[in-house]
């Protein structure tokens, strides 16, 4: 593992109501992150400058679950993992704000508007290799 992946970020998942359970929010501190601002890597590997773009790349794939995998976890297992989806909110630091309502989620987004972002895309590169990573993007 390189020295690039030393940062931590905090993701707040915005989990919509499923008809049985009300809308809820899940906080998770993601370790082993690299934060890149103003550039994006395209699928073909080329680098492109994109003003205001932010990409979090994490090697913490051990704690990552796809949206479906996360939804299928038993309730007592969900705190051990994170997922990432469009409209989730990422703070570019480890924070401990508690969010339980839509209003608190909006307040969190306002509080960290200069040090956070709403997710617009997620790329998973998990193949059981040392280079495995998940990219969480705002573009």
Regions flagged by a language model, labelled:
Residues 1-20, 38-39:
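N-terminal intrinsically disordered, low-complexity, charge/repeat-rich segments that act as generic
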Residues 23-139:
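Short, conserved turn/kink motifs that form compact alpha/beta structural patches or helix kinks used as
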